[in-house]
Amino acid sequence: MHEIEASERELQSAVAGRDMEALERLLGQEFTLTTGRPGHEVRGRAEYLEVTATRYVIEEFRFDELEVIELGPGAAVVRSRYVQRGAMDGVDRSQPFLMTDVWAHRPAGWQLVTRHVSPLASSGP
């Protein structure tokens, strides 16, 4: 398994398990999440961590597709089709998503610097 693919899977497992120590290590200080959801189109790192720790519940997830595109020795893009069963603030978020992640290699290892998520029609995991 590619090192960046392993980091991608570790990150999503950390989100599902609310492993804040792993998320602190895997998310760059400049991290942003772009969702396009009204009122929360873009979340910064601190808000993302707070939501993940307290309001977002993932019961099950999988990657149906995952492609790593290396941009050189210090950067990569990961495109994926991701499916989850979960909720945020009690609202069902069980559906597939298209995700585009940008990773940067830092002295401490690979870090996610930005994620763009596009929800697709619900189909359940």
Task: Set out the residue ranges of the language-model regions.
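A short, structured loop/turn motif at beta-sheet edges
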Residues: 68-76, 103-109
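Hydrophobic beta-strand positions in extracellular immunoglobulin-like domains
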Residues: 82-84, 103
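Short, surface-exposed beta-strand-loop junctions and turns on beta-sheet-rich folds
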Residues: 84-85, 119
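A solvent-exposed, acidic/Ser-Thr-rich amphipathic alpha-helical stretch
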Residues: 2-5, 17-72, 80, 91-95
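Short beta-strand edge/turn micro-motifs at domain boundaries
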Residues: 96-125
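Short, well-ordered beta-to-alpha junction loops that form the rim of enzyme active sites
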Residues: 81-82, 116
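Amphipathic alpha-helical repeat scaffolds
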Residues: 12-13
